[in-house]
Amino acid sequence: MTNHTIYVFAYVAQFGYNTSRHKDVANPHTRVEGSASILALIELNHLTKTFKGKTQTVDALKDINLQIEQGDIFGIIGMSGAGKSTLVRCINFLERPTSGSVVIDGKDLASLTPKELRQLRQQVSMIFQHFNLLSQRDVRGNIAFAMEIAGMKRPQIEKRIDELLEIVGLTDRQHNYPSQLSGGQQQRVSIARAL
């Protein structure tokens, strides 16, 4: 397998690109400038993920160090096979790292019970390349889905959906189904659901 590089771009809360925070996470000796571990909401320390096959071993992630502070918005880009999905899956422990640690809001995920891990995952949202919208639900229904599973009361859900539709600019498409939306609109539904 070719060794590809993953790049993580940090955006400040005002959505302006901050070039001083561009980081090549494949290089373990670089650190994001201006970060302090005390402020980090998400911290990856020497994160490694190795997959062992019958004939070869693949290092999908190798010694990644990264800190994400409150208000940061990150995007992960890289070539196919670079390890982007593996990185995201390790951040929320859908995939257990081979070594290293993932700390979210001061909690080392490896030390959490399954129940504590499920509770923490409710606070961490990620938007994947494929939006996985439910085709039998309209925009409102797709946004409501996670809140319904979390046990929120219907009036709270409806109020939050209205707020989210306004944020992502889909108020006029709230009763459309995924097949009636453009790719960009589907992504905005996914963003609303993550929020």
Give the residues covered by each predicted segment.
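ABC family nucleotide-binding domain
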Residues: 39-195
